[in-house]
Amino acid sequence: MAIKTYQAGVKEYRQTYWQPDYVPLDTDILACFKITPQSGVDREEAAAAVAAESSCGTWTTVWTDLLTDLDYYKGRAYRIEDVPGDDARFYAFVAYPIDLFEEGSVVNVFTSLVGNVFGFKAIRALRLEDVRFPIAYVKTCGGPPSGIQVERDKMNKYGRPLLGCTIKPKLGLSAKNYGRAVYECLRGSLDFTKDDENINSQPFMRWRDRFEFVQEATLKAEAETGERKGHYLNVTAPTPEEMYKRAEFAKEIGAPIIMHDYLAGGLCANAGLANWCRNNGMLLHVHRAMHAVLDRNPHHGIHFRVLTKILRLSGGDHLHTGTVVGKLEGDRASTLGWIDLLRESFVPEDRSRGIFFDQDWGSMPGAFAVASGGIHVWHMPALVAIFGDDSVLQFGGGTLGHPWGNAAGAHANRVALEACVQARNEGRQIEKEGREILTAAAQHSPELKIAMETWKEIKFEFDTVDKLDIAHK
């Protein structure tokens, strides 16, 4: 039997952490990094350094390596690939044994995978492109508190996307006027209205006042329309204790859904709130405020598809995903990829959509994809085609900006939505025939006709910053 001996000193990372013959186990957590190495650092050494610094390695040999089974616990860089059209960077694939991570803790996973390694001097830039969570790890996570089907049953809404609106202006309204805006939107045929992500409890509108006026508006709209309605009450707060206090009050007054800013509020807080919602029968809408700080730079940070997976694991029934056609970043292929990761039970590897690994979610429920940001009635055909039924189409300015007011804007969006869904169900190509479909519907809806006239020239035609690397070929 060979005796382990300790040899002090510094050695190349590749000697321990580069293992090209390794075959990943079904239980391994797999990561794909895009690495920009410093000048003079070769690919194998850079990949091995990332594997080491994101698992159990450090800059020098330590004698305590002899007290554990380093060969079992270490991360392994097992494959390197070229980035299409980019000679300065490469993809490194790293496998981590599942026992490196606390069960059900996306916080712990992120602490390793996107921790100190992102400040490592040997790496000029580093981006986490994708992560494969094995089913053995998925089953330790709570996931969405309710999921798509349970929410549809609670709200009694089937066969179409849900329709929402973010109340504007996002800041400055009093609680009473805010409630009035909510009522007008909901009675105009919307399913949901929403707090903006930065509405918490400011001097112009304290949270308790907002909750009370909004719930009064919601119940009044329900009574008048005969439909279930809801408003996403943002319970994001300075402390977890205050967050739960607000959530409890929302439950007491009968609100069906609350909201959380999962990145700004923190993954730990989000997982805790998701558990609370599951135990208390509440729906949880999740906003992605702060995501672009992490994901928009194509060379450094965390890709949004990873943030999508993290949200599904930690818990949320809705997640904002971009629109493709609106004012926010997101190309079509990438967006379709992370929408599937949010909703489907199994998503196969598909490099054309930026998906590097098969992802099996087992029986974990899916979450609604939320399209929000600079959208109006002219976008409806494309939104229905891109997002499908299991989505929330959320028009803020595209509702409240209607010349005849909030209720008319809401009604215009509902007519446009139902016209597009009906046309799709009849087998029509709604993106190609969108103008014809909307024009026909507008003949019976003056609200839609005015909305189409108001926003006919509004487009957001800017180049996408974070493009799929496949598109660089």
UniProtKB/Swiss-Prot annotation:
Cofactors demanded by this protein: Mg(2+)
Catalyzed reactions per annotation: 2 (2R)-3-phosphoglycerate + 2 H(+) = D-ribulose 1,5-bisphosphate + CO2 + H2O; D-ribulose 1,5-bisphosphate + O2 = 2-phosphoglycolate + (2R)-3-phosphoglycerate + 2 H(+)
GO molecular function: magnesium ion binding; monooxygenase activity; ribulose-bisphosphate carboxylase activity
Keyword Metal-binding in annotation: yes
Residue numbers binding Mg(2+): K194, D196, E197
GO biological process, one term: reductive pentose-phosphate cycle
PANTHER family according to UniProt: RIBULOSE BISPHOSPHATE CARBOXYLASE, RIBULOSE BISPHOSPHATE CARBOXYLASE LARGE CHAIN
Function according to Swiss-Prot or TrEMBL: RuBisCO catalyzes two reactions: the carboxylation of D-ribulose 1,5-bisphosphate, the primary event in carbon dioxide fixation, as well as the oxidative fragmentation of the pentose substrate. Both reactions occur simultaneously and in competition at the same active site.
Protein name according to UniProt: Ribulose bisphosphate carboxylase large chain
